[in-house]
UniProtKB/Swiss-Prot annotation:
Family annotation (Gene3D superfamilies): Glutaredoxin (3.40.30.10)
GO BP terms in the entry: cell division; mRNA splicing, via spliceosome
Main localisation: nucleus
Species of origin: Candida glabrata (strain ATCC 2001 / BCRC 20586 / JCM 3761 / NBRC 0622 / NRRL Y-65 / CBS 138) (Yeast)
Protein name according to UniProt: Spliceosomal protein DIB1
Entry keywords, A to Z: Cell cycle, Cell division, Mitosis, mRNA processing, mRNA splicing, Nucleus
Family: Belongs to the DIM1 family.
Amino acid sequence: MEFLYNLHSGWHVDQAIVTEEERLVVVRFGRTADRECMLMDEMLASVAEKVRNFVAIYLCDIDEVPDFNDMYELNDNMCLMFFYKNKHMMCDFGTGNNNKMNFLPDDKQELIDIMETIFRGARKNKGIVVSPYDYNHKRPSD
C-alpha cells in the first residue's frame, strides 16, 4: 500500500486537501477494522498505482481522528470523499447522497471510472458530476 497514506490528525487531513493542486484528493474515512472498510482499502490499494497521475489517496480512521465526523456527517463505517483544489467534489451516484460514496463499487474498473469522471468534472470547475454508474440499488433502506 505504498500509494495509500494514513492521516493521523485533523491537521494532516487539512494539509492533504489544501496542498494538492493538480490531482483529485480521495480520502477514505472509516473504521479501519470494519470489513467493508478493509475491502475498500484493498480496492484502493489495487488501483492506486494506475491512478497516481491524477489521484492522491489518503486513509483516515474516524475513531482516531474524529475532527470531521460532524462536519462531513461521517456516520458510516466507510466512505470516500473527493476534493479538488481544496473544494469538496460531489457526485450523484443515484443513492440520494451526493456528498460521499458510502458503498463498495462492484469492481476496480468502476472505481477508476468514478475517480476519472470526478477528476474530469473538477477540472471543468463543476461542483457536482454524475457517476458513470447508477447505484440506486445500493441505496440504504429506511
